[in-house]
Amino acid sequence: MSLEIQDSEVDIVIAALQPNLTTFFEAWRPFFSRFHIIVVKDPDMAEELQIPTGFDLKVYTKSDMGVLGATSIDFSGHSCRYFGYLVSRKKYVISIDDNCLPAKDNGGLTVDAVAQHMSNLKTPATPFFFNTLYDPFRKGADFVRGYPFSLREGVECMLSCGLWLHNADYDPMTHVVKRNQRNTTYVDAVMTVPLGAMMPVSGINVAFNREVLGPVMFPALRLRKEGKHRWDTLEDVWNGLCAKVVCDRLRYGVKTGLPYVMRSDAEAGKALESLKEWEGVKVMDVVLPFFESLKLSSTSVTVEDCVKELTSIVKEKLGPQNAIFAKAADAMEEWTKLWKSHGAQSA
């Protein structure tokens, strides 16, 4: 059931939160140069972007976002990458944070994160029964004894969640306590996230089938004091939970593991002691049980149907508990309209 993915079907979307992207693009040149690239500049950043030549890319700025008209969606900070998802016209999107460089595997070879994401998306996922030997479609692996033959064809993978080395992706309090701790373990594995299992998807290093999953790849949940660092945000985690619920309902797959990227230390030393209380802790204590118990109805047969139903449930069940959930539901509803008017077209 493996698919073929052409280079012309892929957009690489980069959210530019820093003005000088020279080091980033030069490091990724061997892997990015054959693809079309969308760079979305944080609308709050005044400085001009510095991008080396030799890439097939288009830069989108605050003025481009203004074309959408009045909208409740905030595309600032890390959320600016979602504008890239909206304006892309390719079937697949790969997005990597601008403070990440190519990683090296256990043999010292530089990892082609783009190629690995494409491999994850074009080979089937196996969400309905866990294969204890990781991804059975990777070279050197297979289905284990006892794995039902009726399930071995798998289903299409819609979301590929990559990982990272070096600077860890912690919540603020953990970042303070473990300021000097680094991710150093490279695990050479890919696995399908089982049906019904939830996980915190990170926007640091991710790829997805935009043609199918685009309507649910939105920036909806924003914390009251959201900043420009990953530890300030939950937009990607909320987005990932929504996407996973939709994939489970429509019998699509989600993978996690390879590829790795190398996160820089640029934000690791920031003073975080002032963050005595992070709203995200309390939010996640509400969010996770909600998504774990959520079952979309059998009448939702498309991603758009699922998003509409999910939006209604969020508004009804979570909205009265906290204003940020009500605003998230509004943003999800708004994204549906924007997708129909600006995002639904394909190349």
UniProtKB/Swiss-Prot annotation:
Pfam families: RGP
Keyword Lyase found: no
Glycosylation site positions: 145
Single GO biological process annotation from the record: plant-type cell wall organization or biogenesis
Main localisation: Golgi
Disulfide bonds listed in the record: none
Signal sequence region: none
Compartment(s): Golgi apparatus
GO molecular function: UDP-arabinopyranose mutase activity
Keywords from the UniProt entry: Cell wall biogenesis/degradation, Glycoprotein, Golgi apparatus
Domain of life: Eukaryota
Site (Required for activity): residue numbering on this chain: 145, 152
GO cellular component terms attached to this protein's record: cytosol; Golgi apparatus
Function recorded in the entry: Probable inactive UDP-L-arabinose mutase. Inactive in vitro, but associates with UAM1 and UAM3.
Family: Belongs to the RGP family.
Protein name, entry field: Probable inactive UDP-arabinopyranose mutase 2
UniProt source species: Oryza sativa subsp. japonica
Lineage summary: Eukaryota, Viridiplantae, Streptophyta, Embryophyta, Tracheophyta
